[in-house]
């Protein structure tokens, strides 16, 4: 299903260690042809008209007498694209973004033989908020819609996975924060995932979260719910159309306190919330060797607290940028649609082609002149740029984006 690996064979398995190698090599073409080759607002693709390794992971799972651990490297574009979306390293010292940038997953723990299993792990683990996996080999699309792309892909903390039956998983989290290496304030993030699969063709995934995730504002509380249903409605390996399935995800959340209100706000305490959905349908053909997915989603996010900061003049989530304010009272609405074609000659490889259209109500995506000042980034990240002669440089942002991508994913 969407967000889950289709692997059934593990050639690198042994008694103590199960190895994994995964690579995502991608070529993307932005129709706006940005001169600085920078893609804005995507967690899947960072560069235009170039072949790039977005993610290279080497590692696997250690398992011995109940003790367990997992390590997966984070090499390639993700090692810079993912850490810059976390503002927490801006608090204090030791450069947490550099300390963790090459780790996709890194945790250790213990497995208890309780009911159908109980795992306690500590470290960095994938969140699966927003349904889609961090590894695009496991997804039906490459460019996931906003309720996935703009929600956490990893957590740093402790998780407890309890399986009371072979159909139910309950997974509480005690974490540093909302996709953060460190804490934003003095309260840890608290959350839980409940995954229920009553039948082989039906799955429910419910994620709930509460935390204080605005750096320097200890009075503001974030609440978020992310809920999905997946349905496989057709299965016939002997027919041309061998399988059919769909997924629907709905997200609702808000921030309250510290100058914001969940709903019904005013000028002194504006409403600050997130609401969005995504829906995809996938067909498999020729005994599941060809896949075709269509779908998309939409979001509204007053306050822009879950909008990815555009990398204008090197801006990050910590620096922000005056060219795209993210503060109470600002507005952001967007929608997207994708068409994805996969060829999967074996369970270890996927050849993918995808067309994406995204639209926002304000200029956000990269236009032809890009988001990098002449001569490269200038001054501190995200600062205003003054050109020789005194003119103020402005980035080229537009309200729409159209993109083609082609990729090869390998998983062994």
Residue ranges of model-derived segments:
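Residues on the lipid-exposed face of transmembrane beta-strands in outer-membrane beta-barrel proteins
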Residues: 21, 53-62, 105-110, 122, ...
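Short, surface-exposed loop/turn motifs at beta-strand boundaries within globular domains
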Residues: 12-16, 51-53, 187
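Short loop/turn motifs that connect adjacent beta-strands in outer-membrane beta-barrel proteins
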Residues: 4-19, 61, 65-70, 113-118, ...
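Surface-exposed coil loops of outer-membrane beta-barrel proteins
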Residues: 30-48, 80-107, 111-196, 203-212, ...
């Amino acid at each position: 299903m969407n967000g889950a690996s289709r692997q059934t064979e593990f050639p690198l398995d042994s008694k103590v260690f199960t190895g994994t190698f995964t690579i995502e090599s991608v070529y993307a073409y932005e129709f706006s042809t940005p001169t600085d080759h920078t893609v804005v607002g995507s967690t899947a693709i960072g560069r235009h008209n170039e072949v790039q390794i977005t993610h290279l992971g080497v590692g696997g799972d250690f398992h011995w007498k109940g003790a367990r651990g997992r390590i997966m490297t984070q090499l390639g574009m993700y090692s810079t694209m993912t850490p810059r979306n976390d503002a927490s390293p801006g608090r204090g010292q030791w450069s947490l973004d550099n300390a963790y940038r090459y780790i996709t997953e890194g945790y250790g723990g213990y497995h208890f033989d309780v009911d159908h299993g109980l795992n306690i792990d500590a470290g960095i683990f994938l969140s699966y908020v927003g349904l889609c996996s961090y590894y695009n080999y496991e997804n039906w699309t490459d460019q996931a819609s906003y309720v996935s792309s703009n929600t956490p892909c990893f957590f740093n903390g402790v998780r407890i996975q309890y399986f009371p039956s072979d159909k139910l998983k309950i997974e509480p989290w005690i974490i540093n924060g909302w996709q953060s290496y460190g804490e934003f304030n003095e309260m840890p993030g608290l959350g839980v995932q409940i995954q229920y699969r009553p039948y082989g063709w039906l799955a429910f995934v419910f994620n709930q979260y509460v935390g204080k995730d605005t750096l320097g504002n200890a009075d503001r509380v974030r609440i978020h719910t992310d809920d999905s249903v997946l349905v496989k409605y057709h299965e016939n390996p002997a027919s041309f159309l061998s399988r059919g399935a769909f997924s629907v995800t709905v997200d609702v959340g808000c921030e309250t306190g510290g100058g914001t209100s969940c709903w019904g706000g005013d000028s002194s305490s504006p409403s600050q919330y997130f609401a969005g959905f995504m829906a995809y349908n996938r067909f498999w053909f020729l005994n599941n060797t060809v896949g075709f997915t269509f779908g998309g989603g939409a979001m509204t996010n007053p306050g822009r607290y879950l909008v990815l900061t555009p990398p204008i003049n090197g801006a990050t989530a910590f620096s922000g940028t005056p060219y795209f304010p993210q503060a109470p009272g600002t507005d952001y609405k967007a929608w997207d649609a994708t068409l994805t074609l996969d060829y999967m000659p074996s369970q270890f490889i996927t050849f993918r082609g995808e067309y994406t259209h995204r639209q926002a109500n304000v200029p956000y995506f990269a236009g032809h002149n890009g988001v990098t000042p002449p001569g490269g980034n200038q001054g501190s990240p995200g600062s205003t740029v003054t050109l020789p002669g005194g003119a103020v440089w402005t980035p080229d942002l537009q309200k729409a984006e159209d993109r083609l991508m082609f990729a090869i994913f390998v998983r062994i």
